[in-house]
Amino acid sequence: MTVEEVGDDYTKDGTVDLQGNPVRRSIRGRWKACSFVVVYEVFERMAYYGISSNLFIYMTTKLHQGTVKSSNNVTNWVGTSWLTPILGAYVGDALLGRYITFVISCAIYFSGMMVLTLSVTIPGIKPPECSTTNVENCEKASVLQLAVFFGALYTLAIGTGGTKPNISTIGADQFDVFDPKEKTQKLSFFNWWMFSIFFGTLFANTVLVYVQDNVGWTLGYGLPTLGLAISITIFLLGTPFYRHKLPTGSPFTKMARVIVASFRKANAPMTHDITSFHELPSLEYERKGAFPIHPTPSLRFLDRASLKTGTNHKWNLCTTTEVEETKQMLRMLPVLFITFVPSMMLAQINTLFVKQGTTLDRKVTGSFSIPPASLSGFVTLSMLISIVLYDRVFVKITRKFTGNPRGITLLQRMGIGLIFHILIMIVASVTERYRLKVAADHGLIHQTGVKLPLTIFALLPQFVLMGMADSFLEVAKLEFFYDQAPESMKSLGTSYSTTSLAIGNFMSSFLLSTVSEITKKRGRGWILNNLNESRLDYYYLFFAVLNLVNFVLFLVVVKFYVYRAEVTDSVDVKEVEMKETE
């Protein structure tokens, strides 16, 4: 290889090895490195969903908690698991770097899994058994037992906070957007990334859930713990092949500086003279594998932060690029807010949807019964099929009409997912109304622990539709927040996606408790321990209306959203999307 060829072989996006040396694309990165990351994600998702998918069943049958309390405990924990990535993104972007942050978080994650497995195994800290189907008559778990169990759960949540935002960004960092070939490969990365996630989830929702229901919780939690150990080992084996990006400073501090500086100069007269605004020379950015961002007309009040007036203190004067990066993170907030409602719908899968399944006939054959939580596997299976069809069929067809390499824009893809969510809750409401009719027809409304003469597969449509919705909304959401985030804030951008799920779960807890209390005071409660006495159909119909209102707000947000564009080879895709939204 000639000197010129060696020079061209080095990445142009500022990626380095762990020692900080420039890296060659023929040795590190691309799909060779991503293969370790993707396989890690398969096993890690198997571990995580091996716990979360059946957690509602464990809390109702082993901790002897009621429907509302169990649902809220699950959604509060899941919400925390999705919220801690904000802290993980901060540490990865500003302090330790993504790789080191990820490895330390893996150790915390694994310790939580180990203690959780012990909490369902050792007699002294394992909750007492109960033979009755009425949880109100069962002996409650002791304070010590609850402390160990929930302590392990939330330790696990802290660990995932450092892994979730950094692992997907590490994977995306393996592709240099300045190289046309790697730029093209990166366009499909998020689709296959989600494919790996839901493949691991499918195994958890089927095999692991069956083991937990039919063999025991010790093995049922021990296998996910082993899976996590395997996933961490696989990731570490790929270390010689990874590209890394150096920490670029706290994105939160950078955004705070811009906001503070703009308020300090609130009375300063504005100008359109570009020389009046502070910016570093282009060479400063090139040395870091970055580039300056030109001023944009939106959120003009923030431009004062880079106005050359007053002192040059960093909390009084920012660069134009820092201002534009802050603008972009703020511009994405309305889109983030729109995703909260569909995230609430996802929270129903492993709580109320599963609770419905416990009341139905679960027999598939004479001797085999499907665990209620395994219905979540149909969400996964539906999504896997939908992603492949989307990537291989839908994109190719729509690309011919739109000229967009993605087929349609990311926001258009989100919009289709939002329409699916309206349909899902209508279908769920109709199905629940039919389930209540079957209970009434057979005189089983006031019976607990008795299975209705209705197959559990009556719930299948709402699970399948949820998977189809995810193939549009969840994939687009992850890619949108990564793609639209500035280069120095990619992990923070990715954490927007996890924040959406966190807030959605917390909102689900709040709404479930509120609706349950209000409806009980006004007569027949909508959500009771005995679902046959509840009106879950009304609750789902309320969700359908909520999704419809949310979709209308989404249309307003899309109308005013301006896509981010940067001076890189990857701008081609964004230019097409900007033209389509004009």
Curated annotation (Swiss-Prot):
Principal subcellular localisation of the protein: membrane
CDD domains (UniProt xref): MFS_NPF5
Inducing factors: By wounding, salicylic acid, abscisic acid, methyl jasmonate, salt treatment and amino acids histidine, leucine and phenylalanine. No induction by glutamic acid, methionine or tryptophan.
Keywords: Membrane, Transmembrane, Transmembrane helix
Subcellular localization, as worded in the UniProt entry: Membrane
Any Pfam family hit: PTR2
Transmembrane stretches, start-end: 77-97, 100-120, 141-161, 189-209, 217-237, 334-354, 370-390, 408-428, 452-472, 493-515, 538-558
One term of GO molecular function: dipeptide transmembrane transporter activity
Tissue expression notes: Expressed in roots. Detected in shoots, leaves and flowers.
A GO biological process held by the record: response to salicylic acid
Membrane disposition: Multi-pass membrane protein
One cellular component term from this protein's GO annotations in UniProt: membrane
UniProt-listed InterPro entries: MFS_trans_sf, NRT1/PTR, POT_fam
Role played: Peptide transporter involved in stress tolerance in seeds during germination and in defense against virulent bacterial pathogens.
UniProt xrefs under PANTHER family: OLIGOPEPTIDE TRANSPORTER-RELATED
The family this protein is said to belong to: Belongs to the major facilitator superfamily. Proton-dependent oligopeptide transporter (POT/PTR) (TC 2.A.17) family.
Protein name: Protein NRT1/ PTR FAMILY 5.2
